Regions:
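Conserved ABC ATPase signature
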Residues: 132-136, 140
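Walker B catalytic motif
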Residues: 132, 161-162
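Conserved ABC ATPase "signature" region
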Residues: 97, 111-128, 153, 158
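Conserved structural motif at the start of ABC-family nucleotide-binding domains
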Residues: 2, 17-18
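The feature captures the beta-strand-to-loop junction immediately N-terminal to the Walker
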Residues: 33-35
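Helix-to-loop junction immediately C-terminal to a conserved catalytic motif
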Residues: 48
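Conserved ABC transporter NBD signature motif
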Residues: 56-64, 73
Length: 168
């Protein structure tokens, strides 16, 4: 379970999040709904430890994330931000393989490649997996990033506006 206890965050003098507490159960879908600027992205970034909270505590499976090692945390929780820009010449397959970094530190095993293949298949990217990211439509690129997060195989996946650029 992810537990957020009395968390606050401010930028300068502006409080973005004030005294927020929430429980996110493992295996459940939880959605944060609110207007632009309500702090949803900031909360997800604090839960994933991309940014530090000013007050309160965040726990994943009863472990305070401030005390978690990066490698261990990356095996428990993954995040897809609402805008992702990697300015490298990568194929979809190479991008998705980044999801396995917490397990292999860039030296992928046969098991890692199985996770990559499964994520590519799940997101219906098999036919274009060798295309470069800069050759893709916005929707194809978004599906590739989602596949990367799936390949990370964490217990919790945080998706910040995951339907951006996807045709529905």
């Amino acid at each position: 379970m992810v537990m957020v206890k009395s968390v606050s965050k401010k930028y300068g003098e502006k409080k973005v999040i004030e005294n927020v507490s929430v429980k996110i159960e493992k295996g459940k879908i939880t959605s944060f709904i609110g207007p632009n600027g309500a702090g949803k992205s900031t909360l997800l970034s604090m839960i994933s430890r991309l940014i530090e909270n000013d007050e309160g505590d965040i726990y994943i499976d009863n472990q305070n994330i401030k005390k978690s090692k990066n490698n261990q945390l990356a095996k428990k929780i993954s995040i897809l931000k609402q805008s992702n820009n990697i300015n490298l010449k990568l194929t979809i397959r190479e991008l998705v393989s980044f999801g396995r970094f917490p397990y292999s530190q860039g030296r992928l095993t046969e098991e890692d490649w199985e996770y990559v293949d499964e994520a590519i298949r799940y997101m219906d990217l098999e036919d274009i997996q060798h295309k470069f990211l800069d050759e893709l439509s916005g929707g194809q690129r978004q599906r590739a990033y989602i596949a990367m997060v799936i390949a990370q195989d964490t217990e919790y996946i945080l998706l910040d506006e995951p339907l951006n650029n996807l045709d529905m």
